[in-house]
Amino acid sequence: AYGTSEARLGKLIKGQRDAWIIASKVGEEFVDGRSVFDFSAAHTRVSVERSLQRLNTDRLDIVLVHSDGDDAHILNHLGTLNILKTLKNEGKIRAIGFSPKTEAGAIQALHTSDVLMLTLNLREQKMLGVIAQAHTQGVGVLVKKGLQSGSLASDDRGASATGAEPIETSLRFLFGQPEVSSVVIGTINPAHLRSNVASALRVLSRIL
């Protein structure tokens, strides 16, 4: 959940909260349509409390720090993960994590995170080593940009050679990584969402 979507999701999950695993992010705000970053402890607490209110829940299952690209500065100087640890100790968050932009940031965040959100897809696989290390250390992995932010084409690696549908080819690759806990797929189109869910179910039925 993120931004306005949290309020929408809050209405959907009313009366069935325990059936959902809810993840949100801190660090990025949209002000008048512009992206603004604030990683301060005060703003992080406000952001989490606001998410709880919008979602009408007493806890968030996962909260990730959404990096602006300067992973080292966030991790070394801003204490954002420290305030998330405090909120976790207060029972408002179950798992905390980091969504880095760099491999170095991902490796550093391994030591202070329960979960990492990492980019992985057929074209971009530089995080595979970090994913393996996360698994060894018991850190969960959520995949972002697994479908290349909607830019998949039939000439993607593996798709044209087999004649397979590119989304299913991508999902088969992602779910074939035993260290991957979940794949985050964003859309604003209900038809696309239904199609992606159907593709994921087909792939998982062959793997599991």
Describe the role of every protein-language-model region.
Residues 43-66, 86-90:
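CE4/NodB-like, metal-dependent polysaccharide N-deacetylase domain
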Residues 1-20:
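N-terminal binding-site loop/beta-alpha segment at the start of enzyme catalytic domains
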Residues 32-35, 154-156:
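Short acidic, glycine/proline-rich loop/turn micro-motifs
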Residues 7-10, 47-50, 125-129:
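Alpha-helical scaffolding within the catalytic cores
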Residues 19-31, 65-66:
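A short, structured active-site edge motif that brings together acidic residues
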